[in-house]
A protein has these predicted regions:
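Bacterial N-terminal signal peptides
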Residues: 15-27
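Bacterial N-terminal signal peptides that target proteins for export
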Residues: 2-17
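Noncatalytic scaffold domains of N-terminal-nucleophile
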Residues: 31-55, 59, 67-188
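Intrinsic-disorder/low-complexity regions
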Residues: 12, 26-28, 56-57
Length: 188
């Protein structure tokens, strides 16, 4: 059994035995405390840090999607309802085990340095300028999340891309009740 803090998706459908979506793993806070109840499933299970993202993942599976489809849809949903935990402006990687072929695949979509970045760009007079390296616009990377999710979908997904992102578009357009933590984050 997989035990990790944060969001994870475990699917036992025929195409995929296990998906570890490390970009979603985050520390659990008081708003996502575990109830202590045991839950079992014979076909598939979706668990995330936010119930709306969990609903999105379950709906994708119920509509014939596989674990990758659900992971992609969940990632976009989390970037709407819990943007500080799973932003599309970030990056990550995905490890996939394909049960039919018994092969493992890794998709690395971590942020990359901008094209004009140089090795010494944060060094001033021979010393690392921490403020420049950590708190300036120069310290940002080129996001990889959307590209990585797209590659995973192209290689392993079943459902149309639009069907995977539509729930997140609806959440963003129609709105949702935010948690106290998100409210605090947005107000800072």
């Amino acid at each position: 059994m997989l035990r990790k803090k944060g969001a994870f998706l475990m699917s036992l459908n025929k195409s995929f035995l296990l998906v570890l979506f490390f970009a979603l793993f985050q520390n659990i806070n008081s708003e996502s405390a575990v109830s202590g109840k045991t839950v079992q499933a014979s076909d598939s299970m979706v668990v995330t840090r936010h119930f709306l993202a969990t609903e999105v993942g379950n709906t994708i599976l119920q509509n014939g999607g596989n674990a990758i489809d659900a992971s992609v849809a969940i990632s976009f949903a989390l970037s709407v309802v819990l943007p500080q935990a799973a932003p599309i402006g970030g990056g990550g990687f995905m490890v996939i085990h394909e049960a039919n072929t018994n092969q493992n695949f890794t998709i690395d979509y971590r942020e990359t340095a901008p094209a004009r970045a140089t090795r010494d760009m944060f060094i001033t007079e021979g010393v690392i300028n921490r403020e420049l390296a950590l708190e300036s616009y120069l310290s940002s990377g080129t996001p990889g999340t959307v590209y990585g999710l797209f590659i995973a979908h192209q290689k392993f997904g079943k459902l149309p891309w639009r069907q995977l992102i539509e729930p997140s578009i609806m959440l963003a357009r129609e709105g949702f009740v935010i948690t106290e933590t998100l409210g605090t984050t947005l107000s800072d």
